[in-house]
Amino acid sequence: MARSLKKNPFVANHLLKKIERLNTKAEKEIIITWSRASTIIPTMIGHTIAIHNGKEHLPIYITDRMVGHKLGEFAPTINFRGHAKNDNKSRR
């Protein structure tokens, strides 16, 4: 279910403050965050945000096509390595 249009998009306060500070300085530095639920807003475009996937922080460069999506969508949490091989020869 989509979020109501009456409400604003959710962005963590600490993340919003860091982005505003970097926009006023016009500097580029990697922003580390654990907030996967934050929505990408237009002020984030051009920044690199390191999103936590449960084990490490993955640096993601924010583009204009990502606006409206959540940060967690771009940092996968599980690594699928394929189904287990049916190894009948080793059981004998």
UniProtKB/Swiss-Prot annotation:
Belongs to the universal ribosomal protein uS19 family. Transmembrane segments: none annotated. One of its GO terms (biological process) is translation. The lineage of its organism: Eukaryota, Viridiplantae, Streptophyta, Embryophyta, Tracheophyta. One of its GO terms (molecular function) is structural constituent of ribosome. This is Small ribosomal subunit protein uS19c. One of its GO terms (cellular component) is mitochondrial small ribosomal subunit. Keywords: Chloroplast, Plastid, Ribonucleoprotein, Ribosomal protein, RNA-binding, rRNA-binding. The gene is rps19. InterPro entries: Ribosomal_uS19, Ribosomal_uS19_bac-type, Ribosomal_uS19_CS, Ribosomal_uS19_SF. It comes from the Eukaryota. Its main location: plastid. SUPFAM superfamilies: Ribosomal protein S19. Protein S19 forms a complex with S13 that binds strongly to the 16S ribosomal RNA. It is found in: Plastid, Chloroplast.
